[in-house]
Amino acid sequence: MTRKYFGTDGIRGQANSFPMTPEVAMKVGMAVGHIFRRKGQTSRVVIGKDTRRSGYMLENALVAGFTAAGMDVFLLGPIPTPAVAMLCRSLRADIGVMISASHNPFYDNGIKLFGPDGFKLSDEIELKIEAMIDGDLTPYLASHGDVGRAKRVDGDIYRYIEFAKRTLPRNIDLNGLRIVVDCANGAGYKVAPAALWELGAEVITINNEPNGININEDCGSTHPIGLMKKVHEVRADVGIALDGDADRVLLVDENGTVIDGDQLMAVIAESWAASDRLEGGGIVATVMSNLGLERFLADRHLTLARTKVGDRYVVEHMREHGFNVGGEQSGHIVLSDYATTGDGLISALQILAVAQEQGKPISEICRKFDPVPQLLKNVRTSGGKPLENKRVKSAIDEATERLGVQGRLVIRPSGTEPLIRVMAEGDDRGLVEKVVNDIIDVISSEGSAAA
């Protein structure tokens, strides 16, 4: 069934443009409030947000919707997405909401929903919400005596800090480490520096002065250049880059080299397997993770289960098949022993624990495999279904045959833009570049011919 509002990670768009309008946000609150409200009992929702200016607008609209549906609202303020999921369980809320567009620019925003178990909602519930939004919500409103209340809560951010700290083994601290943290001017600007400092590290923080419009602006996990420079400048042991809602993380080693999610997952998988903590016989990642990671795991008799792009698909596979480690190359890492969604701070702490335990520098700990040459390019389309074109299909088949068993080809439409993403990888860098460019050329020429 075609979706009108929900994408792979909630509802997202430009603030004050459909669907990210106060009207839609209020209807979301009404619909979700009706679905999750417990009849005859006090029901509550926790709402967090990142640091975008439009967060205030959407927050108030959601409050209006949820209270109209008869739910009490706890407003958490700026707080990481994984903290909302964790507090949803800790505070025994019936629903959790995060207002964020993750790594997107400030002018975008989004609404992510978590059930009482801290996991994102199922497709079935999202489709039910969509149907209600487009219908008459009046019958679902609470009576005048059952309208909910809203209040801002202080101190719950410290619950999350303590929770994150407890994921570090009790016999390990961060004493002696100099850490630079890039908070992306986002939701982690308070919690990440505080947790690291309380664990004993010397913490140098950058991009921790959000003003409503500087979230993710040339900073954070999508722009680690500033962090690389700062690590070199202050001779830090490691740099930690979060994104706007702190659910993803990349590291920078003491030499200023960026360490992506694939390498981080390799470290955790190897460490947890050695201590018999790894479940499922391997890890879960997406089709975009490097072939080098798959080979690294195979050499250790561990599997790599691949899913579609999107951390929700990673989590679904983990839950269905009994894995406890999964993630994406981009730095979304899900450790289900601790969290129900990607958690940048907790993931970073697991890497630091390995480094401290082994007494080795981050560069040595995190270079687990040599990535196979990989190239990703996007080609803009004018609509239609270019991947069903005969010439395009033929070019894809030919490229797949040329790459053979030593390479991979992944072609997929973007979920948010009129783009086709073409990714190839293999041991022969020249061949990888050629097959990607050939496919891009065919898609472009066929698109022009169709127009």
Curated annotation (Swiss-Prot):
How is its cofactor bound, per UniProt? Binds 1 Mg(2+) ion per subunit.
Q: Where is the active site?
A: S102 (phosphoserine intermediate)
Keyword Isomerase assigned = yes
Enzymatic reactions: alpha-D-glucosamine 1-phosphate = D-glucosamine 6-phosphate
UniProt keyword list: Isomerase, Magnesium, Metal-binding, Phosphoprotein
Example GO biological process: carbohydrate metabolic process
- Provide the Gene Ontology terms for cellular component: cytosol
Return the broad EC class. Answer: isomerase
GO molecular function list: magnesium ion binding; phosphoglucosamine mutase activity; phosphomannomutase activity
Coiled-coil regions, chain positions:
none
Post-translational modification note? Activated by phosphorylation.
Quote the EC number.
5.4.2.10
Q: Which cofactor does it need?
A: Mg(2+)
Report the residues modified as Phosphoserine.
Answer: S102
For this protein, the record's InterPro entries field holds: A-D-PHexomutase_a/b/a-I (IPR005844), A-D-PHexomutase_a/b/a-I/II/III (IPR016055), A-D-PHexomutase_a/b/a-II (IPR005845), A-D-PHexomutase_a/b/a-III (IPR005846), A-D-PHexomutase_C (IPR005843), A-D-PHexomutase_C_sf (IPR036900), A-D-PHexomutase_CS (IPR016066), Alpha-D-phosphohexomutase_SF (IPR005841)
Q: Which residues make up the binding site for Mg(2+)?
A: S102, D243, D245, D247
Record PANTHER family: PHOSPHOGLUCOMUTASE (ALPHA-D-GLUCOSE-1,6-BISPHOSPHATE-DEPENDENT), PHOSPHOHEXOSE MUTASE
Briefly, what is this protein's role?
Catalyzes the conversion of glucosamine-6-phosphate to glucosamine-1-phosphate.
Which family would the database say this protein is a member of? Belongs to the phosphohexose mutase family.
What's the name of the protein? Phosphoglucosamine mutase
Gene encoding it? Answer: glmM
